Amino acid sequence: MAQRKMIVFPTKNELSEAMAEYTANLSAKFIKEKGLFTVVLSGGDLIDWLCKLVQPPYIDSIEWPKWHVFWVDERVCAWEDPDSNYKLAMEGFLSKVPIPDKNIYAIDKHLAADGNAEHCATLYEECLKNLVKEKIIPISKKTGYPEFDLQLLGMGPDGHMASLFPNHPQINEKQKWVTYITDSPKPPPKRITFTLPVINSTLYNLMAICDKAPAKSVAEIMKHNNLSLPSAHLSAQVENVWYLDQAAASEL
């Protein structure tokens, strides 16, 4: 699996520009190779940092109709709830690019509104397995798990990624592709999340971290490989790259 690689940018704006270029280059590569591009999003500030993709030159050069979009984790709430990662991504990014609705794979609308985390996780995993049958997502010959092209991740101040939190058992799940949590230390408490083997089966993982709040966790991972922090377990099949701004790297 890919070793962790770190790049520090002077400003958040330069990080955002680099993320857009990285994403656009991989989009072109995979669409040329296989005719589609599978992208996994997370929530939080990440969507704001994707703003460069909806500006020239990327807005016009990317083959958006060939994108297939997923979420590494989601809050179990109504789509229109302010906590929804789907709502965040739609308003800040997806509504501004011509990706077909059928290529956007959100949490089940009705189960999410009902707050049923376990059923939401089961149904999202079934969705992924159906897309394997349809040859949208391959199964990795190396890992035996679904193989996405690019995953864009963020890390919380406590070192969590997706909805895999410190001192919670979900980090150890190896059978399921998608699991759930009902006692998230960060509200809202109910969430679904890709399991660690699925996250690490992705070809290219880009972890983007900005601001001072996560700096201590960044240092714990980069200096000491502190495996009590879920983000320290991040890997990838081809590239595991961490983009930091100066504030996030300030404890290194």
Swiss-Prot record:
Q: Which reaction does it catalyse?
A: 6-phospho-D-glucono-1,5-lactone + H2O = 6-phospho-D-gluconate + H(+)
Q: What happens when the gene is disrupted?
A: No visible phenotype under normal growth conditions.
Which keywords does this Swiss-Prot/TrEMBL entry list? Cytoplasm, Hydrolase
What is one cellular component GO term in this UniProt entry? cytosol
Q: Which GO terms describe its biological process?
A: carbohydrate metabolic process; pentose-phosphate shunt
Enzyme class, top EC level, equals: hydrolase
The name under which this protein is listed is: Probable 6-phosphogluconolactonase 5
